[in-house]
């Protein structure tokens, strides 16, 4: 008997559904591939979430204040007050407000968000340095890796990443704005620039000028420009006005901060800008820009260098106007310098190679010479970068100690009865080491103004070690002469500090 192979052809409708499903899946993947920012964000968000699971994760002083303000915005039972803490920053609170709905997870969610921005800055640095570099793919890859490494080795970068500050996110926004502009995505570039302007005021002139250029270049985006421009003053000045009655409170707080600029603020702020990125990166960036201009008249290189210089000018001018001139204010400029530096290492190597190739017998060795010069430049930079490498390695145990310290502070809060134990009345008061004031306000579910860094009234005083995590213990008003230890949890001591006879509404 002859056997027959029997096959079953699926109905036409099933074939169409399968085809449509495959087509939809393919189109989604193509959409991701065509949107490097979206794809990078997904990957960096996953990395940030993973880092929160395996690395110490706790906010530092300023981020705790943003988390407190976010909770106040979404919680009708808490008053919204921007006094008693650091300067207001709009962009972080746009994230921490929705995070505040999930109180327990808000601090971790914010740190994940900040780290996502930091990882994105490294991707953007890689992309930009690769775009600045011509030649073989390995040359573009080397330029990108060196640029990203330069950012990682900027001063305090690892601290910012561990502790959830906004600076890595700021660098990411600035570099991705440049990347999107170069790829012709001008609307996205403008939105990213607005995001940077909602973190640092130095970005305001840049987004203003870019918006004017875009207004003439692409009339379809004028509505976006108007909304973006309007959002900057509304979000910077509106919430402080509502929360304190002072729309310019952020500026007041910033000017009140002691920047320790010494007798020569101008020279000191310049030194800080130069010291932010590692010295080899600054040097090779300068040499690379010079080669790009005098050899090729490359406007892109010079434009990026001019943007970095312009940011420097703004930081210096604001410092001379009374602002503290901290190193981190320069970070977007440092990001551009690292991009130029990474590309410059390859550019310098190519320049040397082309010079040697003009000689007999060297033309066939151009690639080898380029690789050798890159290797020499990298090796020469290592001794000048070891201190930053050591600083970066030290941040993990420091962050782990901070996690443990704040866990002990939370236990001390529970030991004295939590919010009700510390604040039996609306006028009750508490104080703590200045470095954890905002963290204690979060744990006690109060506004920042109800937790002091000095015992100026009768109340409850939390005293921890004097170190880089907690800062100095609270100063005590001389009138508060009676002190009673009411709890001790590990390194934390909790006192009831009062003026004799004034015990009403004192917790503990």
Which residue stretches match the model-derived regions?
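Membrane-interface transmembrane helices that cradle and orient dolichyl/undecaprenyl
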Residues: 8, 137-138, 175-189
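Perimembrane helix-loop-helix junctions
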Residues: 3, 20, 27, 183-186, ...
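Membrane-embedded, lumen/periplasm-facing catalytic core of multi-pass transferases
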Residues: 367-437, 443, 447, 452
């Amino acid at each position: 008997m002859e056997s027959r192979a029997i096959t079953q052809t699926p109905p036409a409708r099933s074939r169409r559904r399968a085809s449509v499903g495959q087509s939809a899946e393919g189109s989604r993947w193509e959409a991701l591939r065509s949107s490097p920012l979206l794809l990078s964000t997904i990957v960096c968000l996953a990395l940030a979430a993973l880092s929160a699971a395996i690395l110490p994760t706790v906010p530092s002083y300023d981020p705790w204040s943003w988390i407190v303000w976010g909770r106040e915005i979404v919680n009708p039972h808490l008053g919204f007050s921007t006094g008693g803490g650091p300067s207001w920053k709009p962009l972080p609170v746009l994230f921490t407000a929705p995070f505040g709905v999930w109180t327990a997870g808000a601090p971790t969610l914010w740190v994940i968000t900040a780290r996502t921005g930091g990882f994105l800055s490294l991707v953007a640095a890689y992309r930009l340095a690769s775009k600045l570099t011509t030649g073989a793919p390995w040359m573009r890859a080397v330029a990108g890796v060196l640029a990203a490494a330069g950012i990682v080795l900027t001063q305090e970068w690892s601290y910012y990443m561990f502790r959830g500050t906004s600076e890595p996110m700021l660098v990411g926004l600035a570099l991705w704005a440049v990347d999107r502009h170069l790829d012709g995505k001008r609307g996205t570039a403008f939105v990213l620039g607005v995001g940077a302007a909602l973190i640092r005021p130095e970005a305001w002139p840049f987004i203003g000028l870019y918006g004017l250029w875009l207004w003439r270049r692409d009339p379809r985006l004028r509505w976006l420009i108007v909304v973006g421009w309007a959002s900057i003053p509304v979000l910077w000045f509106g919430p402080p006005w509502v929360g304190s009655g002072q729309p310019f409170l952020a500026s007041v707080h910033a000017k009140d901060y002691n920047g320790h600029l010494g007798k020569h603020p101008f020279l000191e702020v310049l030194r800080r800008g130069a010291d932010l990125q590692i010295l080899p990166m600054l040097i090779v960036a300068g040499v690379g820009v010079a080669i790009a201009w005098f050899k090729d008249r490359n406007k892109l290189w010079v434009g990026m260098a001019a943007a970095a210089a312009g940011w420097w000018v703004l930081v210096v001018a604001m410092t001379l106007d009374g602002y503290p001139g901290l190193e981190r204010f320069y970070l977007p400029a440092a990001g551009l310098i690292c991009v130029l530096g990474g590309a410059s290492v390859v550019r310098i190597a190519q320049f040397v190679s082309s010079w040697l190739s003009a000689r007999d017998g060297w033309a066939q060795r151009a690639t080898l010479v380029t690789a050798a010069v890159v290797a020499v430049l990298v090796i020469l930079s290592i001794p000048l970068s070891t201190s930053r490498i050591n600083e970066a390695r030290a941040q993990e145990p420091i962050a782990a100690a901070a996690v443990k310290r704040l866990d002990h502070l939370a236990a001390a809060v529970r030991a004295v009865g939590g919010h009700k134990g510390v604040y039996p009345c609306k006028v009750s008061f508490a104080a703590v080491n200045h470095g954890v004031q905002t963290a204690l306000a979060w744990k006690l579910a109060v506004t920042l103004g109800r937790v002091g860094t000095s015992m100026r009234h009768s109340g409850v005083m939390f005293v921890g070690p004097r170190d880089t995590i907690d800062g100095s213990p609270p100063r005590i008003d001389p009138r508060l002469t009676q002190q009673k230890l009411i709890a001790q949890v590990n390194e934390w001591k909790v006192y009831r500090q009062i003026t004799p006879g004034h015990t009403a509404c004192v917790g503990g």
